[in-house]
């Protein structure tokens, strides 16, 4: 019987920095007895314990591969000399919860995931982790957990779905993704598409397992995981069903044990330079606005000083290169075909736009990883050359002004107008705007203002994909500006500004906008203003009170009490 397993001495890192308390000595006999029941033999108590945290479920195709991949990780941990222990956490499907009460819970799930992984890892004193995720909020939730725990960790993405294919009534044939269905709903409601074609699109959009295929939030965060150095190089782009994913899973299991041997922890990797690399890659791909929210939250957990201003500072230097959906023509599978994320990273590194000395989960630097992979050049079509970009600056911008003194976020990659000015149409929450659009009350040139959808006021900072999809489907995508203290889906297209801070419930200027007020957005100057006299605005504040809280019990009530501004990443604490 193994009762004692000696710790390492000298300068060599302890490969079991946390689990000795449950494996070593007489007092650990009860814990060892429990561990024997789940498969430990005498020789296993000397091995590092690796938590394999999986957000697998059967609710959404995004996570279907994770059961298979977790088992491959387990094999890799064994091969590396560790003992793997799989445990689960939740995941919410944004695609299913979109446009109704369920979306209040989406961003909340990010915190639940991070908290639940922390809880298991801390309670069981597990030494290291491999964190598997497939849907929008589970990716940042896992990365937040890694940063918070600061143990040896590797992140692994489930992979994206293959595009669907549809043939419409008029003979048109095209690839489709989930976002096409949201836009088809709007087109059908506006009489621009038949119910038959809507049905055809519905049946085609999800041909199998994997996350939504464009450069939407899940794929953006997968690219960020790789750019941060928290995922194995080349692991973000292969589709979910591709067996290369099993190889990456096995290697991730081996890698985390090697990180323990070398004493490398998450915060050794997740430095300010790593976050700057992640922002640069996001800008080059034209990634989701949600990346801003999530990177701020992950950086806070890593104790890295990341501010909204960093996104503009970096974005002004980085060209937008990815011709990717929702605004472009291609999907993540196409990125994989031309070499994956390393192709973009090498191009940026060669141009002096990345920190090549940033450490990664391989134990090597970013530059060393790219030299070993030797990725191909940018193909020039899916990923444009640096001297022939889609836009000269990055795909995201932070705006500030009298309407958003705390900041707002816009995906400039799809913003066709440099300057937009129009009269406000104000709605308390999303449903009112949907009803007005259906009734034909929203016209070209309007600025649709949806408020009380912020982190605290929603609560949960819902994504506005239902209304943006409906606006585009109605043929108004280039003619109506939508702004909100809520969020937008990574699949949103059109003139959209989100994350307006302070939010309405906190008496931000958005709370005092009235129908007919002129609002002006100037993208080149990154300004965002309410063109109302200051004296008039002050008069509107007299006697003002926010809308009453919608939820007084349960997780949403707790969340509303704890959550901070979107300008700080909507973190809780």
UniProtKB/Swiss-Prot annotation:
Keywords: 2Fe-2S, Amino-acid biosynthesis, Branched-chain amino acid biosynthesis, Iron, Iron-sulfur, Lyase, Magnesium, Metal-binding
Catalytic activity: (2R)-2,3-dihydroxy-3-methylbutanoate = 3-methyl-2-oxobutanoate + H2O; (2R,3R)-2,3-dihydroxy-3-methylpentanoate = (S)-3-methyl-2-oxopentanoate + H2O
Pathway: Amino-acid biosynthesis; L-isoleucine biosynthesis; L-isoleucine from 2-oxobutanoate: step 3/4; Amino-acid biosynthesis; L-valine biosynthesis; L-valine from pyruvate: step 3/4
Keyword NADP: no
Modified residues (N6-carboxylysine): 137
GO biological process: isoleucine biosynthetic process; L-valine biosynthetic process
Subunit note: Homodimer.
Protein name in the entry: Dihydroxy-acid dehydratase
């Amino acid at each position: 019987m193994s009762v004692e397993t000696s710790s390492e001495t000298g300068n060599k890192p302890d490969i079991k920095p946390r689990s000795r308390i449950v494996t070593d000595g007489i007092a650990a006999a009860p814990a060892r007895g429990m561990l024997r029941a789940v498969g430990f033999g005498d020789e296993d108590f000397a091995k590092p314990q690796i938590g394999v945290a999986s957000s697998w479920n059967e609710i959404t195709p995004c996570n279907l591969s994770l059961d298979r991949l977790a088992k491959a990780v387990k094999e890799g941990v064994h091969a590396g000399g560790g003992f793997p222990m799989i445990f689960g956490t939740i995941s919410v499907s944004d695609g299913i919860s979109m446009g109704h009460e369920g979306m209040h819970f989406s961003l909340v799930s990010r915190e639940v995931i991070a908290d639940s992984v922390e809880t298991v890892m801390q309670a069981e004193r597990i030494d290291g982790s491999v964190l598997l995720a497939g849907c929008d909020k589970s990716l940042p939730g896992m990365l937040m957990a890694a940063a918070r725990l600061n143990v040896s960790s590797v992140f692994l993405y489930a992979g994206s779905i293959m595009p669907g294919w549809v043939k419409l009534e008029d003979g048109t044939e095209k690839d489709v993704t989930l976002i096409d269905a949201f836009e088809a709903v709007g087109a059908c409601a506006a009489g621009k598409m038949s119910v038959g074609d809507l049905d055809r699109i519905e049946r085609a959009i999800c041909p199998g397992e994997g996350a939504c295929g464009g450069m939407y939030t899940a794929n953006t965060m997968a690219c960020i995981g790789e750019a941060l150095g928290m995922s194995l190089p080349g692991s973000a782009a292969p589709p979910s069903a591709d067996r290369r994913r099993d190889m990456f899973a096995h290697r991730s299991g081996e890698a985390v044990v090697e990180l323990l041997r070398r004493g490398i922890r998450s915060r050794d990797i997740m430095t300010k330079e790593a976050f700057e690399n992640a922002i640069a890659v996001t800008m080059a791909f034209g990634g989701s606005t949600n990346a801003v929210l999530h990177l701020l939250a992950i950086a806070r957990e890593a104790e890295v000083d990341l501010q909204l201003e960093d996104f503009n500072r970096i974005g002004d230097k980085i060209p937008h290169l990815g011709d990717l959906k929702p605004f472009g023509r291609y999907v993540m599978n196409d990125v994989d075909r031309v070499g994956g994320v390393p192709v973009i990273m090498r191009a940026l590194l060669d141009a002096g736009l990345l920190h090549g000395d940033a450490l990664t989960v391989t134990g090597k630097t970013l530059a060393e990883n790219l030299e070993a992979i030797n990725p191909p050049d940018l193909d020039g079509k899916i990923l444009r050359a640096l001297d022939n970009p889609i836009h000269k600056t990055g795909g995201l911008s932070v705006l500030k002004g009298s309407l958003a003194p705390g900041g707002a976020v816009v995906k400039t990659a799809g913003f066709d107008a440099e300057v937009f000015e129009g009269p406000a149409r104000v709605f308390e929450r999303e449903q009112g705007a949907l009803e007005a659009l259906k009734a034909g009350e929203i016209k070209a040139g309007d600025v649709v203002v949806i408020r009380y959808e912020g982190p605290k006021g929603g609560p949960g900072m819902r994504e506005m994909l239902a209304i943006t999809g409906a606006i585009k489907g109605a043929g108004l995508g280039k003619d109506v500006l939508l702004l909100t203290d809520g969020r937008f889906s990574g699949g949103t297209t059109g003139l959209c500004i989100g994350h307006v801070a302070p939010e309405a419930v906190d008496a931000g200027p958005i709370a005092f906008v009235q129908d007919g007020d002129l609002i002006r957005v100037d993208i080149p100057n990154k300004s965002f203003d309410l063109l109302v006299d200051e004296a008039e605005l002050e008069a509107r504040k007299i006697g003002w009170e926010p809308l009453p809280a919608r939820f007084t019990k349960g997780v949403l009530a707790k969340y509303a009490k704890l959550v901070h501004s979107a300008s700080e990443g909507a973190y809780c604490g």
